[in-house]
A protein has these predicted regions:
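C-terminal cap of thioredoxin/glutaredoxin-like
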Residues: 5, 47, 130-204
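Sec-dependent signal peptide hydrophobic core
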Residues: 5-12
Length: 204
């Protein structure tokens, strides 16, 4: 347990202590869920330790995915931010990255699914280990992932990019590059935002 806490602390210290990177620095390819040619891009800036993000992920996202992502209407990207406890959120995103593009969202969804129990018990270790294992990151790979400088640098660039876009709260949603809402969205609000994004896209 002590080793695990030390790794999480090192993760947070590493993210906070490196010099800021330029906002235009590359953040790597997007981890897109859905068809790459879907007409509307939905970006959600979220934290794995944000209760509002967890509620959206567990209560609204499944219906959103079925109605918009699985039908080819939307391509979705979750972009990371860190909320307290920031070291746990950072560790979760690092583990999701280590799972690779195909299983990135498997880890993200696994953490959100266990978030309420994690808050209730205070046992972040078990939550992260279980979610990471679902994405194929276990054993020695778990600790190696959390201490990987390249992964920390990549996450830092994503966080810097979010700051550059003025994101201050989670969740925050963009539709085709337009900020729609800071806060949880209902399925009805998503319907309206999707229709507005399509209409704006069709304007000459």
């Amino acid at each position: 347990m002590r080793t695990f806490i030390a790794l999480l602390a090192a993760t947070l210290i590493g993210l906070a202590s490196r010099p800021a990177l330029a906002a235009e620095a590359p953040v790597g390819p997007d981890r897109i869920m859905g068809r790459p040619d879907a007409p509307v891009l939905v970006e959600e800036f979220a934290s794995l330790t944000c209760s509002h993000c967890g509620r959206f992920a567990n209560e609204v996202f499944p219906a959103f995915k079925a109605r918009f992502i699985d039908t080819g209407k939307v391509r979705y990207v979750l972009r990371p931010l860190l909320t307290p406890p920031q070291n746990v959120a950072a560790a979760g995103f690092l583990l999701a990255r280590c799972a690779g593009p195909a299983r990135y969202y498997t880890v993200i969804e696994g953490i959100f699914r266990r978030q309420e129990d994690m808050f209730r018990t205070g046992d972040a270790r078990s939550t992260l280990i279980a979610a990471a294992a679902e994405g194929g990151v276990s054993g020695p790979a778990f600790n190696a992932c959390l201490s990987d400088p390249a992964g920390q640098a990549a996450l830092d660039r994503e966080l810097e990019a979010a700051t550059g876009r003025g994101i201050q709260s989670t969740p925050t949603f963009f539709f085709n590059g337009v900020k729609v809402k800071a806060g949880e969205m209902t399925l009805e609000e998503i319907d309206a935002a999707y229709a507005a994004a399509l209409k704006a896209r069709r304007k000459p």
